[in-house]
């Protein structure tokens, strides 16, 4: 399954547009991770714990979106958009949206 943020894939033509597909994940953070992130905020630097959680959530939503596209008969998803939101004080929501398509190599 090819995934792209652009609406076009070089060397391929879209032969079928199969619809909008999404993937969603809401991840809870935990007390220890919040504490470590607070320390990073105070002393400066990056929060590895939150970065790892963001990466995990992003992988979940892209895989979920790909599976939904496959069920529609797609072999690619184009125009992908990722959105990150905080929900409450300790939840992270990640949403991926794209267009499921069937592509073929250009001749």
UniProtKB/Swiss-Prot annotation:
Gene3D superfamilies to which the protein is assigned, alphabetical = Hypothetical protein apc22750. Chain B
Give the Pfam families listed for this entry. YbjQ_1
Note the superkingdom of the native organism. Bacteria
Q: Which InterPro entries match?
A: UPF0145_dom_sf, UPF0145_YbjQ-like
Q: Which SUPFAM superfamilies has this protein been placed in?
A: YbjQ-like (SSF117782)
Q: Which family does it belong to?
A: Belongs to the UPF0145 family.
What is the protein's name according to its record? UPF0145 protein CHY_0465
Q: Where does this protein come from, organism-wise?
A: Carboxydothermus hydrogenoformans (strain ATCC BAA-161 / DSM 6008 / Z-2901)
The taxonomy runs: Bacteria, Bacillati, Bacillota, Clostridia, Thermoanaerobacterales
